[in-house]
Amino acid sequence: MQLPSRGTDWIAQVLRLPRNAGRGLIWLYRHTLSPLVGYNCRHYPTCSMYGDEAIRKFGLWAGGWMTLARLLRCQPWGTSGIDLVPQTAPSRARWYLPWRYARWRGVNAPPPDVAEPCGCGSHSQLTPH
């Protein structure tokens, strides 16, 4: 009786197509254009890493809006520093109010008692506090 599970697996794969297409575009950017212009993001994780994680966690619609807001904040007069993808989508967000998925100002920094930058000049590692 494996036929029903195969059917649901196929449906799940089709429903993941937009998410995978968005992540594929980010992968393409990270391996073509990003090396040419340099790795110089104002945030940790980088905007492409943030976008990939947001779309992986929340899908193309919600994750795409989160990524758009992050890209608009990543400019000389915007934010910088640690900006993590939220653990959960905002409770006030709805598919027909997509701007509510995103944080348009400030950063999603980890709580001070969870982690802090290692102080080694690179944000590649976080050390527990």
UniProtKB/Swiss-Prot annotation:
<dbReference type="InterPro" id="IPR002696">
    <property type="entry name" value="Membr_insert_effic_factor_YidD"/>
</dbReference>
<comment type="function">
    <text>Could be involved in insertion of integral membrane proteins into the membrane.</text>
</comment>
<comment type="similarity">
    <text>Belongs to the UPF0161 family.</text>
</comment>
<keyword id="KW-0997">Cell inner membrane</keyword>
<keyword id="KW-1003">Cell membrane</keyword>
<dbReference type="Pfam" id="PF01809">
    <property type="entry name" value="YidD"/>
</dbReference>
<dbReference type="GO" id="GO:0005886">
    <property type="term" value="C:plasma membrane"/>
</dbReference>
<keyword id="KW-0472">Membrane</keyword>
<protein>
    <recommendedName>
        <fullName>Putative membrane protein insertion efficiency factor</fullName>
    </recommendedName>
</protein>
